[in-house]
Amino acid sequence: MMILVVDIIKGMQTQTAECLIIGEITCKHMIVVLNKIDLLPPEKRGVMIEKMTKRMKNTLANTVFKDAPVVSISAKSGGDSDLNSSSVGIEELIETLKQYAYVPTRGTSEPFLFAVDHCFSIRGQGTVMTGTVLQGSVNVNDAIEIPSMQVTKKVKTMQMFRQPVEQASQGDRLGICVTQFDPKLLERGLVCCPGYITNIHAAIISAQKIRYFKSSVKSKMKFHISVGYETVMAKVSVFGLMENDKSCEKSDDRGDSFSFQQIYKYQDELLSDESDSTKQIEKELPLKQYVLLEFEKPILASSRSLVIGSKLDIDINSNSCRIAFWGKMLERIVDKNYSTAVLPKLKVYKDKCKTGIVDRIKNANEVIGKDIFKKETNIQLFVGLKVNLSTGEEGVIDGAFGQSGKINIRIPGGLKDTTISQINQGSKKKGKNVAVQDDGNDTGPVKFTVAFKRYAYDPEKRMIQL
């Protein structure tokens, strides 16, 4: 559960909206607190509180917090306030908290992960790390690792709310005492069971675009990526699993799984299924969307970490949302040489299409094509690829014809009589404007296309026709 505190005088500000977005990503329950009601004119206070409450309800109507309660308070009334108490509405807030508080589902089966928010020493005892257990459990005498320091320590003692405990699990606020560790080396960070967290150089995440982010999330752009306590710059590459791909495994999952065995389509940008723009409608929305993150420097991250991408260099006073996308970390890439060791395994294709013109006929089953390749192109790479003529015939590239970039195209089913006539007429009219006959038959040049896929990370740049 989260509490969203709003200055009733200023209303929703950019940072308030961003807190709301982060809240939607991280939890499903919220209480809105309208603070500083003591600053409202006494004679208009009731009306203005009601007006702001209604405005907040309208703001939350299209979010997961549409039923969130709104409580108005004065946490600390000013000296000139007409309010008799130093604070107003706190009791109502406490009662609201009691009403909406719930015990979340907890588990202990996952590896231990602990978020440290403070570190200090106690003379004669050791170093205490205070924080929250994010997942799993820990016991006294367990071995724990401080991955940022690559140091393993033994849990000496533990306390919760000043009371000694032998065991703690997910959700607990905890103090862990270890020996022979300088607290100055760790202020905030992660602690885990040995070997659970390592430095990563890249990652693949599930991805969802934030609908309030006005700009595009385009491949090759750089964003600020927040994972745990760290925020670093990373280059993004967007790709998706298309529903019509033959390799697509039918699943109700919306992006929480990833397989290097699947074939994915490269995307110029991250799409949103909540957008109604014309630009959006023209594009096919993938069944699932992913982002490859290539970090400028290594970061520590656990499996299934929450990842948030932002443009923090946008002026906070510009009244624009800076949070661009979010997702879950599905694949951590630890190899420093991932571009050659890992990425070639990633089957992300780009649709390619080349168009040329039939130059002339060799025989009823062969034609010469031109205006598709440069003379320095290695045409041998394209041999065997299927070709479609604009007149309907299908063919195959047999090889190069001469040294000027022309190619031999074999038509297994043979050319139609109308196609032969059209090619011959086009050959006679080289250099002249092509016309359309009175009977409607096109006498222009016969074109052909070669459609294929190329894997973006294939070092050999091979072409594939599925």
What are these regions (language model features)?
Residues 12, 23-25, 29, 47-48, ...:
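Long, charged, alpha-helical interaction scaffolds
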Residues 16-17, 41-47, 81-87, 128, ...:
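Short acidic, glycine/serine/threonine-rich loops at helix termini
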Residues 1-20, 24-50:
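Conserved Switch II/interswitch segment of TRAFAC-class P-loop GTPases
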Residues 3, 23, 35, 56, ...:
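Residue-level signature of catalytic and energy-coupling elements of molecular machines
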Residues 39-121:
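Canonical P-loop GTPase G-domain recognition
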Residues 9-12, 36-41, 75-80, 135, ...:
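Conserved nucleotide-binding/hydrolysis micro-motifs of P-loop NTPases
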Residues 124-466:
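C-terminal effector/interaction modules appended to NTPase cores
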